[in-house]
Amino acid sequence: MIWTVYLSGEIHTDWRQQIIRGTEALGLPVTFSSAVTHHEASDAAGDMLGEEVAGFWRDHKSAKVNAIRTKSLLENCDIAVVRFGDKYKQWNAAFDAGYCAASGKPYITLHDEQIIHPLKEVDGSAMAWAQTPDQVVEILQYVTASG
């Protein structure tokens, strides 16, 4: 079985690449998907539907267009990894974790110890909490093992 892993959350560090490189080095049977990680492109996803004067409606259109991708990829993944960084509030990541929890999709949270308290409910529904991308790779190695 090839596992599909959805990588959600923080876009300002290379955690995604670290996980991908780690799984490739081990030859794990996984493929990856993700939301659009280019911030400006994501913010402008709804611009093709017409110009908006109010920022709310531009954001609303872009959120809807982005949700086409996100919802489809989350529904089709086997497991999600949801990364919370310490610099920005990742509302999208929290939403993805909630979606996974509500739909019974297993997910791993990835974040530093300093933000355990604000994420206690998110972590409470997660199958695992990792502090490093290497720990995520170790979990993926274990769960994808054929023996």
Task: Explain the meaning of each model-derived region.
Residues M1-G147:
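Conserved catalytic or regulatory cores that recognize and/or transform ribose-phosphate-containing ligands
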